[in-house]
From Swiss-Prot:
It comes from Gymnothorax unicolor. This is Hemoglobin cathodic subunit alpha. The modification N-acetylserine is found at S1. This fish has two hemoglobins: cathodic and anodic. Cathodic Hb has high oxygen affinity, low cooperativity and displays a small reverse Bohr effect. Anodic Hb has low oxygen affinity and cooperativity and displays a normal Bohr effect. O2 binds at H59.
Length: 143
């Protein structure tokens, strides 16, 4: 779970991310699809899975980073706050929950690349804990 100090670090860092969240989402999803080809199966209905393609950018922007941004405000109750999303991924989309951790790793890599001077060891640890908690909350309906 996230300690109060971790929550403070995440919120402060996320204020810096804010305006670039859409770009970061598209890039993180592009990285995941390129580096972990088995994840392509979930997006096979898209016309183009190339890094930076319109479909990838749109999903990264509207879906992924919106959910992560919303989660920053729900840190005190991620399971409750992400319940509908967890249910969607578990019962309708049938996404293997191990992919949440793969995506969270790619989000961390992308954040580090975009904010090299702000992505300190403290931020890295807090963001990793936060994204791990998001992954656990998204996996809740699989149990």
């Amino acid at each position: 779970s996230l300690a109060p100090g971790d929550k403070t670090v995440v919120k402060k860092f996320w204020e810096k991310v804010g305006g670039q969240a859409d770009e970061i989402g598209g890039e993180a999803l592009s990285r995941m699809i390129a580096v972990y080809p088995p994840t392509r199966i979930y997006f096979s209905h898209w016309p183009d899975l190339a890094p930076g393609s319109p479909s990838v950018k749109k999903h990264g922007k509207k879906i992924i980073m919106k959910a992560v941004s919303d989660s920053v405000g729900k840190m005190d109750n991620l399971v409750g706050g992400l319940s509908a999303l967890s249910d969607l991924h578990a019962t309708r989309l049938h996404i293997d929950p191990s992919n949440f951790k793969i995506l969270s790793h790619n989000i961390l890599v992308t954040l580090a690349a975009h904010f090299p001077s702000d992505f300190t060891a403290e931020v890295h640890v807090a963001m990793d804990k936060f994204l791990s908690a998001v992954c656990a909350a998204l996996s809740d309906k699989y149990r």
